[in-house]
């Protein structure tokens, strides 16, 4: 691995690596790999590709969490207008300079809760990919935040939420899925198949059943097991 840059981040040192053989780049922060992006900006992680496929039907997409910007880049390339919010301004600089995120992708320096409270616009597609070292998903995606996400969702819209799990027994995705289900949304839990010790779970929530066949097909194609939350 070749080191391209180092930054001082709020959670610790940020290092950008490049694989000499492939040109793919990694975003490493305080001992945690945050992003893996293929040369040119395409998503290198299956969960990001899953989120991109699920959200791709929206003409306007709101994303929380920047990282390497691969999700925003994929959706922008598909013709969507994309707005990314992140409370760490350096994330946008890193995504554009080192991970090929287009300048046409809109950026807003704010945290998710503040954005949801202060904005009134609705969006047909909302993606949540926030996290980092010692991140508390239960605190950030509490009942109030899930209710606000629902309010910002346009009719027939879809929400995709990524949760990085520490173990196969991690029950965080189920708890947050239950909170979204309480907002009168149909919720699917998509997990790595089979779930490994450290894995990603993607929650997909929408307000009608027309998407269900698409969700299961996309999950199967990318190696995820999807089941509906009752």
Language-model features, listed with the residues they occupy:
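The AdoMet/dcAdoMet-binding core of the Class I SAM-like
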Residues: 6, 21, 42-158, 167-177, ...
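SAM/dcSAM-binding transferase cores
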Residues: 1-41, 46-49, 53, 178, ...
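Short loop/edge segments at beta-strand edges and connector loops
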Residues: 108-111, 191, 226
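Residues at alpha-helix termini
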Residues: 78, 98-99, 183, 222, ...
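A short, terminal or domain-edge coil/loop segment
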Residues: 113-119, 140-144, 184, 210-224
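Short, structurally constrained coil/turn elements
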Residues: 10, 101-103, 183
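Conserved Class I S-adenosyl-L-methionine
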Residues: 171-192
């Amino acid at each position: 691995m070749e080191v391209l840059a180092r930054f001082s981040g709020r959670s610790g040192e940020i290092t950008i690596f490049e694989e000499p053989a492939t040109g793919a780049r990694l975003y490493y922060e305080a001992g945690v790999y945050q992003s893996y992006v293929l040369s040119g900006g395409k998503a290198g992680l299956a969960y990001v590709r899953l989120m991109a496929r699920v959200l791709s039907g929206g003409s306007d997409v709101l994303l929380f969490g920047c990282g390497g910007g691969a999700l925003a880049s994929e959706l922008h390339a598909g013709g969507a207008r994309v707005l990314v919010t992140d409370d760490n301004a350096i994330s946008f600089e890193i995504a554009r300079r080192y991970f090929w995120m287009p300048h046409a992708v809109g950026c807003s320096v704010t945290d998710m809760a503040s954005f949801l409270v202060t904005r009134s616009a609705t969006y047909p597609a909302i993606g949540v990919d926030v996290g980092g070292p010692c991140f508390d998903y239960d605190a950030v995606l509490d009942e109030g935040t899930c209710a606000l996400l629902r309010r910002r969702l346009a009719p027939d819209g879809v929400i995709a939420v990524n949760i990085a799990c520490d173990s196969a027994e991690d029950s965080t995705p189920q708890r947050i899925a239950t909170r979204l289900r309480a907002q009168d949304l149909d919720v699917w839990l998509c997990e790595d198949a089979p779930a490994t010790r450290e894995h990603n779970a993607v929650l997909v929530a929408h307000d009608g059943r027309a998407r269900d066949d698409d969700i299961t097909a996309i999950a199967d194609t990318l190696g995820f097991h999807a089941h509906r939350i009752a």
